[in-house]
């Protein structure tokens, strides 16, 4: 479980991250990261989008739990005030935990590299 202050809940936060943040996609996942320099004292916040295309409720919740456990390890490395949205593709329903972790690692490295470059 992610800490309460690290969870993204408001629709407006999701919209801002998706519209203004950097995007990186792979076969199983797409990530959107927005680093906001003005909110450095706030913790990074993470939200998950797992649509009905992924599967029924049990499958969607399973994918969301897996992603949450993987993303928890990235929280300390994210800049303060950043917004991260992780969107699962339908293939994520049948993927192994290791495959999800590997793809998320690639997505995160791409996103962080793009955002750090944009801040310079």
Sequence positions of predicted segments:
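Positively charged, solvent-exposed patches that mediate nucleic-acid binding
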Residues: 1-120
């Amino acid at each position: 479980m992610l800490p309460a202050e690290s969870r993204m809940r408001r629709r407006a936060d999701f919209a801002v991250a998706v519209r203004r943040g950097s995007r990186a996609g792979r076969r199983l996942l797409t990530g959107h990261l927005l680093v906001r320099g003005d909110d450095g004292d706030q913790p990074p916040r993470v939200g998950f989008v797992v649509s009905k295309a992924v599967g029924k409720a049990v499958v969607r919740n399973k994918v969301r739990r897996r992603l949450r456990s993987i993303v928890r390890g990235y929280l300390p490395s994210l800049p303060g005030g950043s917004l991260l949205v992780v969107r699962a593709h339908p293939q994520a329903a049948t993927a192994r935990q290791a495959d999800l972790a590997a793809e998320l690692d690639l997505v995160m490295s791409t996103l962080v590299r793009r955002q750090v470059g944009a801040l310079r």
